[in-house]
Design a protein with these regions (language model features):
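Short, solvent-exposed secondary-structure capping/transition elements
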Residues: 33-35, 61, 120, 124, ...
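Residue-level marker of regulatory loop/turn positions in helix-turn-helix DNA-binding domains and
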Residues: 14, 18, 100, 104, ...
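Short amphipathic alpha-helical interaction segments
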Residues: 100-118, 122-125
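Amphipathic alpha-helical dimerization/coiled-coil segments
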Residues: 146-200
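Short alpha-helical segments that sit at the start of domains
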Residues: 1-82
Length: 200
């Protein structure tokens, strides 16, 4: 029997999960080349989000270089040496726009809010002035959060989907039904993907 391995419609493919990254970052492990923090001091949401996005960018750049190496192998060429690899990695990394990755800060805020509702992260009491407060004094300050005992002991499966953990009555069938109500449209092909005639 042949099983088709095809992703379902909706959602985004990520080299690593948002929940996994948040937990590893707040544990002070510096996941995927991110900065190492003091787990007791914690970090603010804005910084975690920034390091998460940059880590995904690095993973994308690594995948691009890996694809080039695969093409070189197919052509009978040797793979990049360390210096060449680093040059190609820097090349791709410098050309990834910050907003290319689909995760937006609003989505990250919602994700982090679920973690707070579950009691997996807690406010440390430390605050810093946000740059926005320079021209809008009523803006909220930068608040630091750290993992709680419950957050450290929560299993990976729950960290990967805190919304389902928080609202177990909303299972996969609920989200499938919601997706079926949406209208998906195909994006217009880019110039490089359009079929050109042999004469062009």
């Amino acid at each position: 029997m042949v099983i088709q391995l095809r992703p379902e419609r909706g959602g985004y493919i990520r080299p690593f999960g948002c929940g996994w990254f948040i937990r590893e970052f707040l544990l002070g492990h510096g996941p995927e080349g991110a900065a190492v923090i003091d787990p007791e001091i914690g970090a603010c949401q804005e910084d975690i989000f920034f390091h998460y996005k940059k880590a995904i960018h690095r993973a994308y750049a690594e995948d691009a270089v890996a694809w080039e190496n695969e093409e070189r192998i197919k052509k009978g060429k040797s793979i990049y040496n360390e210096e060449e690899y680093n040059d190609r990695f820097d090349y791709f990394l410098s050309r990834i726009p910050y907003k290319l990755v689909k995760c937006r800060y609003h989505s990250f805020q919602r994700y982090f809010h679920w973690l707070k509702q579950l009691g997996w992260v807690e406010f440390t009491g430390k605050e810093e002035k946000a740059s926005m407060q320079d021209y809008y004094p009523d803006a909220p300050p930068r608040r630091f959060y750290r993992l709680t005992k419950e957050g450290k002991s929560a299993p990976n499966q729950e960290w990967s989907n805190p919304q389902l953990t928080l609202y177990p009555e909303r299972g996969l069938d609920y989200f499938r039904e919601k997706r079926s109500q949406r209208k998906y449209s195909r994006k217009a092909p880019t110039k490089s993907r359009r079929k050109t005639s042999s004469g062009s």
